[in-house]
């Protein structure tokens, strides 16, 4: 099965969740399936970005600008995080319309 999220995808936090920010982290309660999710500092940064629809490549670029991380590691970790958030129904994904 191909990945759901690519660098060309647009992602946005679902409206069916409640989140709370704490110092350096965020916790999310997914109302669709009753899932509870906790994110570290970088995950919280990503979560803040996906409150509005944003292309995954733009999220990657923002992380690279904000944190010291290798490009390839940033990309793979970001895609894994977004896949996990999608699996827990915490984000909605719009694929590249050209595909």
Please give the residue ranges for each predicted region.
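Long, charge-rich, low-complexity alpha-helical segments
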Residues: 22, 35-99
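Long, low-complexity, charged/polar intrinsically disordered regions in eukaryotic proteins
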Residues: 1-26, 30
């Amino acid at each position: 099965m191909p990945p759901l999220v690519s660098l060309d995808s647009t992602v946005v936090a679902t409206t069916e969740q409640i989140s709370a920010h704490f110092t350096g982290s965020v916790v999310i309660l997914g109302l669709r399936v009753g899932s509870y999710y906790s994110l570290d500092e970088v995950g919280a940064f990503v979560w803040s970005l996906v409150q509005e629809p944003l292309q995954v490549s733009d999220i990657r670029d923002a992380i690279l600008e904000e944190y010291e991380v290798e490009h390839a590691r940033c990309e793979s970790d970001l895609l894994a995080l977004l896949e996990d958030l999608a699996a827990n129904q915490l984000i909605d994904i719009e694929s590249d319309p050209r595909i």
